[in-house]
Swiss-Prot record:
The keyword Nucleotide-binding applies. This is Probable nicotinate-nucleotide adenylyltransferase. Pfam families: CTP_transf_like. One of its GO terms (biological process) is NAD biosynthetic process. Catalyzes the reversible adenylation of nicotinate mononucleotide (NaMN) to nicotinic acid adenine dinucleotide (NaAD). It is an enzyme of class 2 (transferase). It comes from Bacillus cereus (strain AH187). Belongs to the NadD family.
Length: 189
């Protein structure tokens, strides 16, 4: 059975924190690949102004293109409406019955697991991998695999705010992503 990690998110924008998490879990669990799963409309962010799918996908491609063990999975982008992890993983497990999926989540999402849509059935489809993020504990009633990662306190919301305030984002996200953001005027106030 193949072992593949899945890291979902809006990736608005993708940054070195996403890449660090994916790479650390890849090595810690001896995965074959890590698939980045950009969300269409995540239920917990419904109503927030999210950058276009096309721009987020382009930035994600730029961020991951140099790592041969990173791929982009378009499963959620092909659907309309809110993206529920259960629905996505049900489709992926049907398409790839030879794969054991490891769904990678940060500490904030570990604490939120009891509120996830159809969590009990989702646990039959994936192994959850919780990574330590600053300020969060990994306490949950559900079985998760824990991976320790070096502390790197950057988030997409922090980057959007820094761009809005015209502060530098150098060394926080890949240079190609930074150039794309600046050329396309993303995150300006």
């Amino acid at each position: 059975m193949r072992k593949i990690g899945i890291i979902g998110g809006t990736f608005d924008p993708p940054h070195y924190g996403h890449l660090l998490i994916a790479n650390e879990v890849y090595h810690a669990l001896n995965l074959e690949e890590v698939w980045f799963l950009p969300n269409q409309i995540p239920p917990h962010k419904h109503g927030r102004n999210i950058t276009s799918v096309e721009s987020r996908l382009q930035m994600l491609e730029l961020a991951t293109e140099e790592e041969e063990h990173f791929s982009i999975c378009l499963e959620e982008l092909s659907r309309k409406g809110p993206s529920y992890t259960y629905d996505t993983m049900l489709q992926l497990t049907k398409k790839h019955p030879d794969v054991q999926f490891h769904f990678i989540i940060g500490g904030d999402m570990v604490e939120y697991l009891p509120k996830w849509y159809n969590i009990e059935a989702l646990l039959d489809l994936v192994t959850f991998v919780g990574v330590a993020r600053p300020g969060y504990t990994l306490h949950t009633p559900y079985p998760i695999t824990t991976v320790e990662i070096p502390e790197f306190a950057v988030s997409s919301s922090l980057l959007r705010e820094r761009y809005k305030e015209k502060k530098t984002c150098k060394y926080l996200l890949p240079e190609k992503v930074q150039v794309y953001i600046e050329r396309n005027g993303l995150y300006e106030s």
